[in-house]
């Protein structure tokens, strides 16, 4: 850890189209090689597709998807006397959101649809309905934490 202490958290700029910091965070996660306009086109296209498919506000669908993907527990490796234990710990709210966005974008990229816009839209739609690979990742993470509950006393 640096001597000055942790770096201060920078505020997330609110998205001009949907007036939501969540959309800005999603754009930042999609961003590759500094091509913000491309990332914005992908995200806004996916949001419009969500609006057409669901008939609801896409930000609400995004929030529902995020809630379904956010983990509440995860495991961290802890070395105790030559053995490495997977210790379950609670996930802080900021990290939960970051992990959820990371998983949504990662599993969107792994999907089979033709364009990234379609992939992201369908992954968000699946996640908001409690389906999809990103929700499965959360369930697997919780399962790992549950199966290693015996090592919870090694928390730090």
From Swiss-Prot:
User: Which superkingdom is the protein from?
Assistant: Bacteria
GO cellular component terms, alphabetically, are:
small ribosomal subunit
**Which gene name belongs to this protein?**
rpsG
Give the originating organism: Streptomyces griseus subsp. griseus (strain JCM 4626 / CBS 651.72 / NBRC 13350 / KCC S-0626 / ISP 5235)
InterPro entries, A to Z: Ribosomal_uS7, Ribosomal_uS7_bac/org-type, Ribosomal_uS7_CS, Ribosomal_uS7_dom, Ribosomal_uS7_dom_sf
Q: Does the keyword Mitochondrion apply?
A: no
Pfam family of this protein, just one? Ribosomal_S7
UniProt keywords, alphabetically: Ribonucleoprotein, Ribosomal protein, RNA-binding, rRNA-binding, tRNA-binding
Q: Which family does it belong to?
A: Belongs to the universal ribosomal protein uS7 family.
Lineage of producing organism:
Bacteria, Bacillati, Actinomycetota, Actinomycetes, Kitasatosporales
Instruction: State what this protein does.
Output: One of the primary rRNA binding proteins, it binds directly to 16S rRNA where it nucleates assembly of the head domain of the 30S subunit. Is located at the subunit interface close to the decoding center, probably blocks exit of the E-site tRNA.
Quaternary structure and partners? Part of the 30S ribosomal subunit. Contacts proteins S9 and S11.
Extract the SUPFAM superfamilies matched here. Ribosomal protein S7
Tell me a GO biological process for this protein. translation
Could you tell me which HAMAP family the record lists for this protein? Ribosomal_uS7_B
User: A GO molecular function for this record?
Assistant: tRNA binding
Q: What is this protein called?
A: Small ribosomal subunit protein uS7
């Amino acid at each position: 850890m640096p001597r000055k202490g942790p770096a201060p958290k920078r505020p997330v700029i609110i998205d001009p189209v949907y007036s939501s910091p969540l959309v800005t965070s999603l754009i930042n996660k999609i961003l590759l090689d500094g091509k913000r306009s491309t990332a914005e086109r992908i995200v806004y296209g996916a949001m419009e597709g969500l609006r057409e498919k669901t008939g609801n506000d896409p930000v609400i669908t995004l929030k529902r998807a995020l809630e379904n993907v956010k983990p509440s527990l995860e495991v961290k490796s802890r070395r105790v006397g030559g053995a490495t234990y997977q210790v379950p710990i609670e996930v802080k709210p900021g990290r939960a959101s970051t992990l959820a966005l990371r998983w949504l974008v990662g599993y969107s990229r792994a999907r089979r649809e033709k364009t990234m816009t379609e992939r992201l839209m369908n992954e968000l739609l699946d996640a908001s309905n409690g389906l999809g690979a990103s929700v499965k990742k959360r369930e697997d993470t919780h399962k790992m934490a549950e199966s290693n509950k015996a090592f919870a006393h090694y928390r730090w």
